Amino acid sequence: APQEPVYPGDDATPEQMAKYAAELRRYINRLTRPRY
């Protein structure tokens, strides 16, 4: 199973938050992709 990205924290930089958001979207896409 894909690793869940780690939340960088409330004091994270905008760059860290953007990276986390992108990784989280990829993670969710992997989880919800149908298994054919």
From Swiss-Prot:
Biological process according to GO: feeding behavior; neuropeptide signaling pathway
Residues modified as Tyrosine amide: Y36
Presence of the UniProt keyword Hydrolase in the record: no
Role this protein plays: Hormone secreted by pancreatic cells that acts as a regulator of pancreatic and gastrointestinal functions probably by signaling through the G protein-coupled receptor NPY4R2.
Organism of derivation: Didelphis virginiana (North American opossum)
A GO MF label: neuropeptide hormone activity
Gene3D superfamilies: 6.10.250.900
Keywords: Amidation, Hormone, Secreted
Annotated localization: Secreted
Coiled-coil stretches noted in the UniProt entry, renumbered to this chain: none
CDD domains, alphabetized: PAH
Cell inner membrane in keyword set: no
Family designation: Belongs to the NPY family.
Protein name in UniProt: Pancreatic polypeptide
Chief localisation class: secreted
